[in-house]
A protein has these predicted regions:
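Formylglycine-dependent sulfatase
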Residues: 2, 16-415, 421-466
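Sec-dependent N-terminal signal peptides
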Residues: 4-14
């Protein structure tokens, strides 16, 4: 009897050891155009986001988290590669993102999070918006992902009825129609629906994400869940339409929160929650041009398309009950940091043949140590607009809002803001701190020299019309 008891204890011990030594899973929930002020835990008084708020309480709420660029394509390239988009040609002054007539995509020599995790036996999936090249040779399957399901670019593209849509889009209760937009829904490399029924897209993304978790629960996995919402045009399922009794935009956000809850349930149901890191964030700030359909940056200045805080500081939460130490992190971090952080937590190798701009935040997550990110360069449309070091941020170029006919403003003299004391960037203190301005400008010059070997512009090209 004692021998059997001993054997049972040994099996139990080694089983627990194997479980604790298993590489962690990673889930990134990446919203489209979600503003800093659009989440309950980040200050919105009306939007109900109980699942995201739960993540913020049980995990880490990051109040100073940045994206690599204030628009879609370059921001996504930065997250997946850990590199400023200027380095791999994924930002442009001519065309700001990829379009359905774009011949290019994320250069295949770039390495993504999926590609550095694959050698460790990770299953990988990209579900949702891709926007890094829609041609077969640039789809997620060519960038380390085992599975793809989603719309390959923005949900407002491939349309000849933009004018008709815009005439109605400012109505807060306007519910768009699929007929305006001919975007395809792709599974792996095959178009399975066109136009995609966007009223069910958040639900279908969620179903595919949960299926992936269920299918791969016995091995480590990386799930990149990139929602198409709340980028305009706004779509929501019948179940959520009108549920908030506030506006269509709020309905959309609350459906995304439901989606987050379904992902957390799947992890908990399969006993994966204590060995998984879930990141919730956004690709850039809100598209304020669309008013009630465009969200809110809360206390931050401006929104999408700008290098003010509202354009590149995004609501971010890290959750993982067995890995992430709970708390509020009022330090800098960025989506650029996800690649080196996931590499550190998993034991993956970071490429050494190229510059990685991200920092390893793993000790902040596990021990609430001090963040190693002390600076951030604000790029937009292939131009360096601003730079932050510690609490000080200097601007040399600006755009107030994304509007394709509006040029970048070259400032006559630099503007300086103390971001810790002046989160809304209202008070220019450049004249009071000329030495700080000089120091930051020197850093910008060094950075510009550092990116001189960048790949050529990948976004500017157009395919010939048939």
């Amino acid at each position: 009897m004692k021998n059997w008891l001993f054997i049972f204890i040994c099996f139990a011990f080694f089983g627990l050891s194997a479980q604790s030594e298993k590489s962690p899973n990673f889930v990134v929930v990446f919203c489209d155009d979600l503003g800093y002020g659009d989440i309950g835990s980040f200050g919105h008084p009306l939007i109900q986001t109980p699942n995201i708020d739960r993540m913020a309480v049980e995990g880490q709420k990051w109040t100073q988290f940045y994206v690599a660029d204030p628009v879609c394509t370059p921001s996504r390239a930065g997250l997946l590669t850990g590199r400023y988009p200027i380095r791999n040609g994924m930002t442009s002054s001519k065309r700001h993102v990829f379009f359905p007539d774009s011949p290019n995509g994320l250069p295949l020599e770039e390495l993504t999070i999926a590609e550095i995790l694959k050698p460790l036996g990770y299953a990988t999936a990209a579900v949702g918006k891709w926007h890094l090249g829609h041609l077969p040779k640039f789809l997620p399957g060519q960038q380390g992902f085992d599975y793809y399901y989603g719309i390959p670019y923005s949900n407002d593209m491939d349309s000849d009825k933009w004018g008709e849509y815009l005439e109605q889009s400012e109505d807060p209760d306007y519910f768009s129609n699929t007929k305006f937009f001919n975007v395809p829904l792709i599974e792996n490399a095959d178009i399975i629906e066109r136009p995609a029924d966007q009223t069910t897209i958040t639900k279908r993304y969620t179903e595919k994400a949960v299926q992936f978790i269920e299918k791969n629960k016995a091995q480590p996995f990386f799930l990149y869940l990139a929602h198409s919402m709340p980028h305009i045009p706004l779509f929501v399922s019948e179940e959520f339409r009108g549920r908030s009794k506030t506006s269509l935009y709020v309905d959309v956000i609350e459906e995304i929160d439901w989606s987050v809850g379904e992902v957390l349930k799947a992890l908990e149901k399969n006993n994966l929650d204590k060995n998984t890191v879930v990141v919730f964030t956004s690709d850039n700030g809100p598209w304020l041009l669309f008013k009630t359909h465009g969200g809110s940056a809360g206390p931050l200045r401006a929104g999408k398309g700008t290098t003010f805080e509202g354009g590149q500081r995004v609501p971010t939460v890290f959750w993982g009950p067995g890995i992430v130490s709970p708390g509020v992190i009022d330090q800098m971090g960025a989506t650029l940091d996800l690649l080196p952080t996931f590499a550190s937590l998993s034991g993956a190798k970071i490429p050494t043949d190229r510059k990685i701009d991200g920092y390893d935040l793993s000790k902040v997550l596990t021990q609430k140590s001090e963040s190693s990110r002390k600076e951030f360069f604000y790029w937009a449309f292939a131009e360096l607009h601003a730079y932050r070091n510690e609490q000080y941020k200097v601007h040399i170029k600006q755009r107030e809002a994304i509007h394709y006919g509006r040029p970048t403003l070259e400032l006559d003299s630099p503007e300086l803001y103390d971001i810790n004391a002046d989160i809304s960037e209202k008070y220019d203190i450049a004249e009071t701190f000329p030495r700080v301005v000089s120091k930051l400008l020197n850093k910008m010059q060094l950075h510009l020299k550092d990116v001189q070997d960048a790949l050529p512009d990948q976004l500017a090209g157009r395919m010939a019309k048939e």
